From Swiss-Prot:
Residues 91-112, 136-167 are annotated as: Disordered. GO terms for biological process: translation. Residues 119-167 are annotated as: Unknown. Part of the 50S ribosomal subunit. Contacts protein L29, and trigger factor when it is bound to the ribosome. Signal peptide: none annotated. Residues 1-118 are annotated as: Large ribosomal subunit protein uL23. This is Large ribosomal subunit protein uL23. It comes from Mesomycoplasma hyopneumoniae (strain J / ATCC 25934 / NCTC 10110). Residues 97-112, 136-157 have a biased composition (Basic and acidic residues).
Length: 167
């Protein structure tokens, strides 16, 4: 069996995290594999020394979803104990991640400064626009009052003309 086909993936649960601190790692493995193949595969893939391998089959479990019933699939689980001094890093290397985080923090502060500057510029433009609108509204109100006065004068002139023509 091919080394890459033996290990299907890590099993990451609360219990497996506790076991990792003592050097025991849990993997989902191919149902056709045995202890020696699993040991060779882990040593080859992760470049570590294996002390002990325990393999067992996890049985299928009944699951219910509403009215329907079903089963989870059974799988083979391997608990691999490493020699002292060896560890397997199942996650990304954390040190480059810390550098990325610090870079993103500095980028975020620069972006926040740019955003604050743009907000200030927009507020200044909004104030200018508000002042212009206020001036235009004042001019329109003045024109409206003038037109109202002119209309009143026309109406008065028309009524006077009608009275004069009636006399």
């Amino acid at each position: 069996m091919n080394v890459n086909e033996i290990i299907k993936g890590p099993i990451l649960t609360e219990k497996s995290y506790q076991l990792m601190s003592s050097g025991v790692y849990s993997f989902k493995v191919s149902p056709k594999t045995n202890r020696s193949e699993t040991k060779k595969a882990v040593e080859y893939i992760f470049n570590v020394k294996v002390e002990k391998v325990n393999i067992f089959t996890v049985p299928k479990k009944e699951k219910k979803l509403g009215k329907s019933k079903g089963f989870t699939t059974k799988y083979k689980k391997a608990l691999v104990k490493l020699m002292p001094g060896y560890t397997i890093n199942l996650f990304e290397d954390e040190s480059p991640q810390d550098q990325k985080d610090s870079e993103t923090v500095s980028e975020n502060t620069e972006e926040k400064a740019k955003i604050a500057k743009k907000k200030a510029e927009l507020e200044a433009k909004n104030k200018e626009i508000a002042e212009k609108l206020a001036k235009k509204q004042a001019e329109l109100a003045k024109k409206d009052s003038e037109t109202n006065e002119n209309q009143e004068k026309r109406i008065e002139n028309q009524t006077e003309n009608q009275e004069n023509s009636a006399n």
